[in-house]
Regions:
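Terminal, non-globular segments
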Residues: 1-193
Length: 193
């Protein structure tokens, strides 16, 4: 009896040598997702350093790159975004636009602690992500201020400027949220919160 095309055929036991190195559809989607996140951080870094550094509101500017890194961590969760957070903070420090090397552990630790709190106690929604992002950004700016004040680079009166910088960064965060949320949907949900 002749086989028909719609009948069951067993899988091939061995693939070609090239097929072993080709990424699967899920791997391609994950690579696309994290590449788009990296591109978003890079574009925000360029936008911050080229355009927004010239726009001063009450003597301060926004700080979009740490805000975006922390937003991505809030959306993706601590387990999936920890390596991205470390590498993005490393590139932020290496770009020369960060206040110092202490920013890398500050961004990473604050983002991971607040993200773990959000994952453990709050649902994933715009309100909870924005509230946790506000805590993280204000905490980051206060750590930057404390280190700068202890090292003698700023006066205590500049604390309002750091608070205003955090508020300006949070004012831009609702514009970043839809972009990051759209990228987060690539590849489907790995688990539901």
């Amino acid at each position: 009896m002749a086989r028909r095309s719609f009948e069951y055929r067993p899988d091939r036991t061995e693939g070609s040598l090239l097929a072993r190195f080709l990424p699967t559809k899920k791997q391609r989607q994950k690579l696309l997702k994290w590449s788009l996140y990296s591109l978003l951080v890079l574009v925000l870094s360029l936008l911050q350093d080229v355009l927004l550094c010239k726009v001063r509101i009450l003597g301060t500017t926004t700080d979009l790159v740490p805000c975006c890194i922390m937003l991505i961590c809030m959306l993706e969760g601590a387990q999936r975004s920890s390596i991205f957070c470390v590498t993005a903070a490393l590139f932020f420090v290496a770009s020369g636009s960060s206040p110092g090397y202490y920013v890398m552990p500050a961004i990473t630790l604050i983002a991971m602690v607040v993200t773990m709190f959000r994952q453990g106690y709050l649902r994933l929604s715009f309100g909870t992500v924005f509230a946790c992002l506000a805590v993280a950004v204000f905490g980051y700016e206060m750590i930057v201020f404390a280190v700068e004040w202890i090292s003698g680079r700023v006066l205590l009166e500049r604390m309002t400027a750091f608070t205003l910088k955090a508020a300006l960064s949070l004012a831009v965060a609702p514009l970043l949220y839809p972009m990051a949320a759209a990228i987060e949907k690539i590849g489907g949900e790995s688990w539901k919160e």
